[in-house]
Amino acid sequence: MARSLKKGPFVADHLLSKIEKLNEKGEKQVIKTWSRASTIIPDMVGHTIAVHNGKQHVPIFISEQMVGHKLGEFAPTRTFRGHAKSDKKARR
């Protein structure tokens, strides 16, 4: 079920305040955050946000196509190393 339009998108308060401060100054800095549930809003476009994936912070450059998505969508939490290779010599 989608979020109510009257509520607006969820963005963590600390993240929103940091973005607004950087926009006022006109600076571009990497912003570290653990808030994977925050929605990307148009104010974030052009900034680099380092999103925590459970182990480290993954830097993500925000573009216009990302608006409306969640930050966590762009920082995968699992690493797939491939299925086990079949060893044909062991079968014989």
Swiss-Prot record:
Q: Pfam families recorded for this chain? A: Ribosomal_S19
Tell me which UniProt keywords the record has, alphabetically: Ribonucleoprotein, Ribosomal protein, RNA-binding, rRNA-binding
Report the record's Gene Ontology biological process terms.
ribosomal small subunit assembly; translation
> In the record, what terms sit under GO molecular function?
rRNA binding; structural constituent of ribosome
Q: Which family does it belong to?
A: Belongs to the universal ribosomal protein uS19 family.
Query: Could you state one GO cellular component term attached to this entry?
Result: small ribosomal subunit
Identify this protein by name: Small ribosomal subunit protein uS19
Q: Which InterPro entries match?
A: Ribosomal_uS19, Ribosomal_uS19_bac-type, Ribosomal_uS19_CS, Ribosomal_uS19_SF
Reply yes or no: does the keyword Ribonucleoprotein apply: yes
Which SUPFAM superfamilies is this protein grouped with?
A: Ribosomal protein S19
Entry function: Protein S19 forms a complex with S13 that binds strongly to the 16S ribosomal RNA.
Q: Is the Hydrolase keyword given for this protein? A: no
